[in-house]
Amino acid sequence: MINNKPIIGIPIGDPAGVGPEIVVKSLTQAEIYEKCNPILIGDAKVIKQAMGFCNVNLNINSIKKVDEGKFTLGTIDLIDLNNIDIDELKIGKVQGIAGKAAFEYIKKSVEMAKEGELDAIATTPINKESLREGNVNYIGHTEILADLTDTEDPLTMFEVRGMRVFFLTRHVSLRKACDLVTKERVLDYIIRCSEALEKLGVKDGKMAVAGLNPHSGEHGLFGDEEMKAVVPAIEEAQKMGYKVEGPIGADSVFHLALKGRYNSVLSLYHDQGHIATKTLDFERTIAVTNGMPILRTSVDHGTAFDIAGTGQASSVSMVEAIILAAKYSPKFKK
């Protein structure tokens, strides 16, 4: 039975990691069903095993189509791909069968989202080594999703307690990140981040651009990247009509955003934004992938092989990712 709540697809991730466990725990929470209709994409055998690890007793409703879902607390609605030999699965270990299965869960989720069966997807952890062992030639979720949706350059946003953070650079050295702070790149990201916010239905407020150097360079005393690149980019963006301010010192900009002065912050390098969000609330820092024709949220932790199978993994991040997907999906513009 389908109601008017958003339908959120949840691929269960690497079946040898904590993904199945955090999903099972999440679906014991009434809040999830109050805000959305969750559907798992995975393997019934893996879910049953995860329930055993977590000492959780839920019914499994294996379905072929979304409209067969019950969407009631106490029942897991599952698209069962039946693609794992549970006797061969080694919990907490890198293995090709797990990587291949995880990829198939993602692929099915994307297909359903592209066909309009899902309003968004909330993804669970996968393992890069297991993908490689399974001959899946991607390094992670974002690359898989980009390829499956024909998206050239997806944009990552973190959200925690209402604070949104974008990243000018991500997985590059700090030295290279400084070299990538150019007027052209900063302007491009201001435009793209503004468009991403609009797609999510965020229309009020201004974006802030963080400074790179101490005190945003102090007029060139501590570095000139702000004077040469950041300020000219912001001024040009303002002339184009974009609501943006900065550069604002990184020691205060996140505090100001959290207080509501800004609707988002453009962080200039990986750790600048990661430290701010994860110090605020590590478990509730959720990644939102923008720029694709589908909406995707994700936990920001890994497969945690060291505790997989113990039932110890916290589901706080997973619950938050599902709820955030439900929050944005009614406003999301493809």
Swiss-Prot record:
Q: What does this protein do?
A: Catalyzes the NAD-dependent oxidation and subsequent decarboxylation of D-threonate 4-phosphate to produce dihydroxyacetone phosphate (DHAP).
InterPro entries xref list: PdxA_fam
Listed A to Z, the keywords are:
Carbohydrate metabolism, Metal-binding, NAD, Oxidoreductase
What this protein needs as a cofactor is: a divalent metal cation
Q: What class of enzyme is it?
A: oxidoreductase
Name of the protein = Putative D-threonate 4-phosphate dehydrogenase
Bound cofactor: record note = Binds 1 divalent metal cation per subunit.
Residues given in the record as a divalent metal cation binding sites: 171, 215, 270
Q: Give the Gene Ontology MF terms in alphabetical order.
A: metal ion binding; NAD binding; oxidoreductase activity
**Matches recorded under NCBIfam families:** pdxA (TIGR00557), PRK03743.1 (NF002992)
Catalyses:
4-O-phospho-D-threonate + NAD(+) = dihydroxyacetone phosphate + CO2 + NADH
Pfam families noted in UniProt: PdxA
In which family does this protein belong, per the annotation?
Belongs to the PdxA family. PdxA2 subfamily.
Assembly with partners or alone: Homodimer.
EC number from the UniProt entry: 1.1.1.408
Task: Tell me the SUPFAM superfamilies matching this sequence.
Answer: Isocitrate/Isopropylmalate dehydrogenase-like
Gene, per the UniProt record: pdxA
Amino-acid positions noted as binding substrate in the UniProt annotation, renumbered to this chain: 141-142, 278, 296
